[in-house]
Amino acid sequence: MKKRLHLIIADSELELVPESIIDHPAIVNYAKRRKKKPEKIILDSTYHHAALRQLEDGERRGRPDIVHICLLNALDSILNKEDRLRVYVHTRNDEVIYVDPSTRLPRNYNRFIGLMESLFEKKVVPEDLQLLRLEKKTLAELINEISPDAVFIMHENGEFMIPKHFGKLLASFKKPVVIVGGFPHGDFRSKVEGVKISLYREPLMAWTIVNEVIVSYEWEVIK
């Protein structure tokens, strides 16, 4: 069996506008400009920061940009081109996006948002190819489905390990899962068992961690 890295962007702050703030002026005006129903748009702190103050955890929510950048980097990696990577997005509301390795995401952020809105509505996009598929599922359920032989959680308080050594560790398993938080700060909301790893003495952005993990694994499995 070919070794593959299974990368999960977990507890991602990617969600439709919650019902509790649908009538907020910041949401209503934004929806009107885009000619969409408020309940059909993706929550985005860039445009909805005033409404976010009314939400629990509002300071960390509405960050689809994190998912966008992480996916662009992962899907364009050599590891993915060599069919050695599988990527999943798990959201704060326990939805899982299955990402086909051949998916070519829009580089343009606004087009990416439109794509995510279509995905949340239709559950699969495009409907004929199903490159992206959305299912209701917890992080624990996703990990159980993958059935890995090791689970690593990237965490600022984890065991320190330089990327090169972490790559060697990952490559010693056939089906490792690496979990990266898809949120700007704070801790994971989901409870999951695994070995916590830190790659640097300071906190790093999610997409930086994704890059470091992928490249460290590439060095070990692609010759």
UniProtKB/Swiss-Prot annotation:
<dbReference type="InterPro" id="IPR029028">
    <property type="entry name" value="Alpha/beta_knot_MTases"/>
</dbReference>
<dbReference type="GO" id="GO:0070037">
    <property type="term" value="F:rRNA (pseudouridine) methyltransferase activity"/>
</dbReference>
<dbReference type="InterPro" id="IPR023503">
    <property type="entry name" value="Ribosome_NEP1_arc"/>
</dbReference>
<dbReference type="GO" id="GO:0070475">
    <property type="term" value="P:rRNA base methylation"/>
</dbReference>
<keyword id="KW-0694">RNA-binding</keyword>
<comment type="similarity">
    <text>Belongs to the class IV-like SAM-binding methyltransferase superfamily. RNA methyltransferase NEP1 family.</text>
</comment>
<keyword id="KW-0808">Transferase</keyword>
<dbReference type="Pfam" id="PF03587">
    <property type="entry name" value="EMG1"/>
</dbReference>
<dbReference type="InterPro" id="IPR029026">
    <property type="entry name" value="tRNA_m1G_MTases_N"/>
</dbReference>
<keyword id="KW-0489">Methyltransferase</keyword>
<keyword id="KW-0690">Ribosome biogenesis</keyword>
<feature type="site" description="Stabilizes Arg-63">
    <location>
        <position position="65"/>
    </location>
</feature>
<comment type="subunit">
    <text>Homodimer.</text>
</comment>
<feature type="site" description="Interaction with substrate rRNA">
    <location>
        <position position="111"/>
    </location>
</feature>
<protein>
    <recommendedName>
        <fullName>Ribosomal RNA small subunit methyltransferase Nep1</fullName>
        <ecNumber>2.1.1.-</ecNumber>
    </recommendedName>
</protein>
<dbReference type="InterPro" id="IPR005304">
    <property type="entry name" value="Rbsml_bgen_MeTrfase_EMG1/NEP1"/>
</dbReference>
<feature type="binding site">
    <location>
        <position position="186"/>
    </location>
    <ligand>
        <name>S-adenosyl-L-methionine</name>
    </ligand>
</feature>
<comment type="function">
    <text>Methyltransferase involved in ribosomal biogenesis. Specifically catalyzes the N1-methylation of the pseudouridine corresponding to position 914 in M.jannaschii 16S rRNA.</text>
</comment>
<feature type="site" description="Interaction with substrate rRNA">
    <location>
        <position position="63"/>
    </location>
</feature>
<feature type="binding site">
    <location>
        <position position="181"/>
    </location>
    <ligand>
        <name>S-adenosyl-L-methionine</name>
    </ligand>
</feature>
<keyword id="KW-0949">S-adenosyl-L-methionine</keyword>
<feature type="site" description="Interaction with substrate rRNA">
    <location>
        <position position="104"/>
    </location>
</feature>
<keyword id="KW-0699">rRNA-binding</keyword>
<dbReference type="GO" id="GO:0019843">
    <property type="term" value="F:rRNA binding"/>
</dbReference>
<keyword id="KW-0698">rRNA processing</keyword>
<feature type="binding site">
    <location>
        <begin position="199"/>
        <end position="204"/>
    </location>
    <ligand>
        <name>S-adenosyl-L-methionine</name>
    </ligand>
</feature>
<feature type="site" description="Interaction with substrate rRNA">
    <location>
        <position position="107"/>
    </location>
</feature>
